[in-house]
Amino acid sequence: MLTDKTIIVSLTSRLFADEITKLQKKIGSILPLQDPHKLQSLDTLGLNAVCSRDVFPDYVHMFSYLSKCTLAILEEVNPDNLILTRLDPSETYQIKNVYEPMFQWDGFSNLTVIPPVFGRQQATVTLESNGFDLVFPSVVPSDLAQAIIGKLLLYNLYSRLVESDPEINIEEVNMYTTNVTHMGRHYVLDINHNNPNEALKSLDDLAVYTCILSALIPRACLRVLTILMRHDQHELLDVFRGIVPREVYEIDANALSIGDDITRMTTFITYLQSLSSIFNLGAKLHLSSYASETQTATCWISYC
């Protein structure tokens, strides 16, 4: 049934029978679109625009793309068009767990839409009839998505270290950065030949924010620890006060006026927020129910 959230993607040629079969197995999955318009062409659908088979994938760029594009559910496959439902906040939708590799969902899962970091080939349905690769994203638990972007940045960081220091063992770098573990299972990330451009820009930002925070943290730490001393404080505060370097306690907290002190604390909090923005994964899907027999979930979307 067509609604005001329906998006119709027109095809340039009729789909072959085997292509229809492959796409029907993907019904209920999430696909990104460049725009929210109701009528669109095939080249706006999926990740092919940022994940071409001819170039090394820039996964950080894809993360950014996914955080800005329109997300929709594949609802219907016809020989001449594809029907999708746009995901809007404050509405509930039905999606299906039809991704490779498949991660277990439950009725309380928070999911994140991420690039096909487990391999472009298994995330792609090639439509020879239209001369187009329809590249699907992966949908994984949000904590796993956080781990993946961390591994991706670390891989690009330590790959540069290997280039400058031949003593560093690349195999050891790969062992720690090119796989993730979830619920006791190991998954290999296809990041050995990724395009590092956007990852390095993110690492530049990380370095800048870390430098600024390193200058602000000692005084901020002292202020927070001393001001929060009280009868009903968190029981772990005493424990963690003991791991703070001695030189922090030697800072003269009264050397600045209260105005300058508050300004520094404001800057500290601002840059903490800026640092976290590097790892912002965009939209999240919150499940309210999941039926493992049909692999169908009811969810709503948020962008915070």
Swiss-Prot record:
Main location: virion
Molecular function terms, GO-annotated: structural molecule activity
Keywords: Capsid protein, Host nucleus, Virion
Pfam families xref list: Herpes_V23
Top-rank taxon, per record: Viruses
Location(s), subcellular: Virion; Host nucleus
GO cellular component entries: host cell nucleus; viral capsid
Self-association and partners: Interacts with TRX1 and major capisd protein/MCP.
Protein family per UniProt: Belongs to the herpesviridae TRX2 protein family.
Function comment: Structural component of the T=16 icosahedral capsid. The capsid is composed of pentamers and hexamers of major capsid protein/MCP, which are linked together by heterotrimers called triplexes. These triplexes are formed by a single molecule of triplex protein 1/TRX1 and two copies of triplex protein 2/TRX2. Additionally, TRX1 is required for efficient transport of TRX2 to the nucleus, which is the site of capsid assembly.
Protein name: Triplex capsid protein 2
Source organism (scientific name): Saimiriine herpesvirus 2 (strain 11)
